[in-house]
Amino acid sequence: MMPECGTQCYLCDLPVRFDNYSGCSHACSYCFARHRIDISQISKKETSKALMNFISGARTKETNWCDWDIPLHWGGLSDPFQPCESKYRSSYKCLKIFADENYPFVVSTKGRIISDKEYLNLIKNCNCVVQISMVCNKYDVLEKGCPSFAERLKILESVSRVARRTIARVQPYMREVFLDVYKNLQLFKNAGAYGAIIEGMKFKRKKDGLVKVGGDFVYQYEDIKKDFLELKQKCHSIGLKIYAGENRIRSLGDSLTCCGVDGLSGFLTNTFNLNHILNGDKVLPSPRQKTDGTAGWF
C-alpha cells in the first residue's frame, strides 16, 4: 500500500496521509475512526518501502495529481507512536527515511514513544511539524489508553526542544472545557508550542445547541465562532498562532492551512482546493492537475 488521499481532499492543503499502523490502542471514547472500522485490531499497514517509493516520485490513481514533494500527513487514522511501536519499530524506520531524505511531513500523536531519546535524535534532523494532541486534564477519563494530559505537556516540551515546530492539537474541542483550554494555552506556550489547532467535537446524536452538518451534529456556527475568537485573542496576547481545524471557521485562523506549516520553507501545500477558492484566493492548478484523469479523488 502507498500513501493515500483522505476524504477531505477537495478542502485540505495536506490531503495525502501516511499510516504505517492500522488500529489504535489509545481507546479514546470520542474517536471518529471507531465509527468506521474496528480499531481494536492493531497491525502494521503501509511500509517504510512504500514511503520511500512515494518520496521517490511513485504515485497511485489517488495521488497522480501531485507532481511535487507535497508534505505528508503522517498519522491520519492511526497514531505512529502508540505502544505497538515498541514491538514493531515501523515508525523508527520511517523517521530514518524522513530524516535521510529531508522530506517534509506533519505527524500527529498522543504517544510517549516520540519523546524517547533515539526518536528525538531523528526528529532533530527531520523537516517536520509535530502535533501533540491534547485538550485538558478533564479528558483523561476519555483517553484511558493515552498518557495523561500532564505527561503530554512534558512530551510537548521535550519534542519542542528538537523539532522544527510543534503544535498543540486541541481536537476534539468541547465547549464544556472552554475555560480549561483558555488557561492551557499559556501552558502550551511555556512548553514550546508554536501554535494551537482548534476543532469542535462532532457528535453522532442530536443534542441541544447542535446542528447537523453532513453526517454529524456540530456546534452552532455562532457558538463555535465565539469560542474560537476568544481563544484567538488569548493566543495572540501570549505569542501563539491559532488555526481552525474545522471547515466552517477555517478563515478565522491565522492561516487557511490549518496544520501549522505556514511560513516554513520546503512545505509546499496544495492550495488548489475549495478552501482557498471559496475564501477568495487566486489559486492555479499544478501542471499535473491539468492532465486528464487526475481529478478523480476531488
Give the positions of each predicted feature.
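Residue-level detection of beta-strand scaffold positions
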Residues: 15, 104-106, 239-243
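Glycine-rich anion/phosphate-binding loops
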Residues: 45-53, 111-112
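Short, glycine-/Ser/Thr-/acidic-enriched flexible segments
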Residues: 23, 79, 249
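Auxiliary Fe-S-binding modules of radical SAM enzymes
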Residues: 180-298
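Canonical Radical SAM [4Fe-4S] cluster-binding loop centered on the CxxxCxxC motif
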Residues: 1-49
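Conserved AdoMet/S-adenosylmethionine-binding subsite of the radical SAM
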Residues: 56-227, 234
